[in-house]
Amino acid sequence: MVRRRGLSGLLEADIYGITAWEYSLGRSNIEVVAQMIEAGIKVIQYREKERPARQKYEECLKIREMTREAGVTFIVNDHVDLALLVDADGVHLGQDDLPADRVRELVGDKMIIGLSTHSPAQARAAEKMGVDYIGVGPIFATKTKKDVCDPVGLEYLEFVVKNISLPFVAIGGIKEHNIAEVSSRGAKCIALVTEIVGAEDIKAKVRALRAIISRKED
């Protein structure tokens, strides 16, 4: 069995960080990622839809260097070419991106492939595609993705917990005030975007989120 590089970090992660420059209070993605790493986040995804390709490449090169040094799993959203160029640990695909099985042909056996899902049918299909994990959401309404579907709610999360064998990351509109609902439904790894990148003190925010998660696990 092939062991994907960085997969252990993903499987052990409680919080999954995602970049979003426009919500980062004027800080660069490099500054935010540095603070995420300092806060102990073990998986970081680079997701920037609107930036020029060259800028994405340069940012990802630096983030790859930072995450590798810190032992943090680094995922690139959507762009398989970018993930390959910077030697990322993985790539995360949407339902309208390249088919996961064809991406596997491109990236080989050692790269993690994640896939966003929004319904039971998509989750069941993902189990047959050879992806390593799925995104489950959006759980709640979110402003960071303009083309996203309506919230799927906690019901879909509960379906995945009970019926799907793949590791998963809960995502979409998750904040400090509702993360307990997500954690208590069985989500072990939770992605937050604006709640983390938009925090003045990222380390303190992550500490507060973890305190809530740990209370729900007790």
Swiss-Prot record:
Pathway: Cofactor biosynthesis; thiamine diphosphate biosynthesis; thiamine phosphate from 4-amino-2-methyl-5-diphosphomethylpyrimidine and 4-methyl-5-(2-phosphoethyl)-thiazole: step 1/1. GO terms for cellular component: cytoplasm. The keyword Metal-binding applies. It is an enzyme of class 2 (transferase). Mg(2+) binds at D78, D97. Keywords: Magnesium, Metal-binding, Thiamine biosynthesis, Transferase. It holds the Pfam family TMP-TENI. Transmembrane segments: none annotated. SUPFAM superfamilies: Thiamin phosphate synthase. One of its GO terms (molecular function) is magnesium ion binding. Binds 1 Mg(2+) ion per subunit. 2-[(2R,5Z)-2-carboxy-4-methylthiazol-5(2H)-ylidene]ethyl phosphate binds at T142, K143, T144, G173, V193, T194. 4-amino-2-methyl-5-(diphosphooxymethyl)pyrimidine binds at Q45, Y46, R47, E48, K49, N77, S116, K145. Its cofactor is Mg(2+). It catalyses: 2-[(2R,5Z)-2-carboxy-4-methylthiazol-5(2H)-ylidene]ethyl phosphate + 4-amino-2-methyl-5-(diphosphooxymethyl)pyrimidine + 2 H(+) = thiamine phosphate + CO2 + diphosphate; 2-(2-carboxy-4-methylthiazol-5-yl)ethyl phosphate + 4-amino-2-methyl-5-(diphosphooxymethyl)pyrimidine + 2 H(+) = thiamine phosphate + CO2 + diphosphate; 4-methyl-5-(2-phosphooxyethyl)-thiazole + 4-amino-2-methyl-5-(diphosphooxymethyl)pyrimidine + H(+) = thiamine phosphate + diphosphate. CDD domains: TMP_TenI (cd00564). Its EC number is 2.5.1.3. The keyword NAD does not apply. Signal peptide: none annotated. Belongs to the thiamine-phosphate synthase family. Condenses 4-methyl-5-(beta-hydroxyethyl)thiazole monophosphate (THZ-P) and 2-methyl-4-amino-5-hydroxymethyl pyrimidine pyrophosphate (HMP-PP) to form thiamine monophosphate (TMP). This is Thiamine-phosphate synthase. The gene is thiE.
